[in-house]
Amino acid sequence: MAENLAGNDRLIWIDLEMTGLDTDRDSIIEIATIVTDAQLNVLAEGPELAIAHPLETLEAMDEWNRNQHRRSGLWQRVLDSQVTHAQAEAQTVAFLSEWIRAGASPMCGNSICQDRRFLHRQMSRLERYFHYRNLDVSTIKELARRWAPSVANGFAKSSAHTALSDVRDSIDELRHYRQFMGALGGDAAAGVEG
């Protein structure tokens, strides 16, 4: 699909669900990716993969994670899964390679530095697929919260705390902030769709 690789402005959006936030102890249990163009139009959704872990690993999670992942259905999907970290990484890289060259896209999402740390340890090939830069929507959210609270309060996530719903929320959230970015918002901020 060489024609699909032409756009260097394409963006890879990613989200991980983990057993917790400790990058030395916890583990990735779900991954999802979406590729957009520079105007945040979705070009393709990658595989949404629950990663196999034993019941003991899930039971060792803190209460918030146990409750959240049971409620979202991820708990059972992880127990039913036969996908390993290596398989999830390979499937995700294979998908991305159809849409964008390695090293062309920053890692995009919310609190993406945390995801990058987990990827570095558990899916290093995938982590290296991204440019070293990050497009972290959380940064814009934190600035808006401080400088323009009404803008920050104007967006409500609909997420079910699954990887794919969180990726979609991140894209929607950046679309929301883009309309308030003045000259940085480009044609979209001026009401012109690209």
UniProtKB/Swiss-Prot annotation:
It holds the Pfam family RNase_T. Residues 11-174 form the Exonuclease domain. It comes from the Bacteria. One of its GO terms (cellular component) is cytoplasm. Its EC number is 3.1.15.-. Transmembrane segments: none annotated. SUPFAM superfamilies: Ribonuclease H-like (SSF53098). CDD domains: Orn. SMART domains: EXOIII. Keywords: Cytoplasm, Exonuclease, Hydrolase, Nuclease. The active site is at Y132. GO terms for biological process: DNA metabolic process. GO terms for molecular function: 3'-5'-RNA exonuclease activity; nucleic acid binding. It is found in: Cytoplasm. Belongs to the oligoribonuclease family. 3'-to-5' exoribonuclease specific for small oligoribonucleotides. PANTHER family: OLIGORIBONUCLEASE, MITOCHONDRIAL (PTHR11046:SF0). HAMAP family: Oligoribonuclease. This is Oligoribonuclease. It comes from Xanthomonas euvesicatoria pv. vesicatoria (strain 85-10) (Xanthomonas campestris pv. vesicatoria). The gene is orn.
